[in-house]
C-alpha cells in the first residue's frame, strides 16, 4: 500500500470517527492496518464494527468489490446488538460523499 493510499485511508477513518463521536459514540481505532474492522463504535444500545474504504475510483462500488469485503465481515462473530458495516467515502474532485453499506 502506498503512502498516499495510507494517508487517504487514515483521513477517511478520522472523518468516520469524528462523525460517530458527534453522534455520541465512543470510538476505538483498530490496532492493525490489516484487521477486519478499522474502527469500533460503542453506543448506548449498539456496537458497530466498521470497515472504512476511501476511493476516487467508482469501480470500488461494483458489487464484486464490495462482496469480497462483505464475505470477510460476514463470517466474524456477531454478538447481540453488534453490526458490521462498510463505509465508503467517494473522494473525487468536487464530490466528497459518504456512501453507507450497512448491516453486512
Where are these regions (language model features)?
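Conserved catalytic cores of phosphodiester-cleaving nucleases, focusing on short active-site segments
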Residues: 20, 39-41, 45-57
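Acidic-basic catalytic patches of nuclease active cores, encompassing PD-(D/E)XK
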Residues: 1-30
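A short, charged, amphipathic alpha-helix used as a generic interaction element across diverse proteins
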Residues: 71-73
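Active-site metal-binding core of divalent-cation-utilizing nuclease and nuclease-like domains
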Residues: 22-36, 40-44
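Domain-level recognition of nuclease-like catalytic cores that cleave nucleotide substrates
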Residues: 7, 78-104
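Short connector loops at helix/strand junctions that flank enzyme active sites
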Residues: 34-36, 45-49, 79-82
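Structural signal for conserved beta-strand scaffold positions within catalytic alpha/beta enzyme cores
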Residues: 29, 51, 86-88
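Active-site-adjacent loop/helix micro-motif of nuclease/hydrolase catalytic cores
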Residues: 56-69
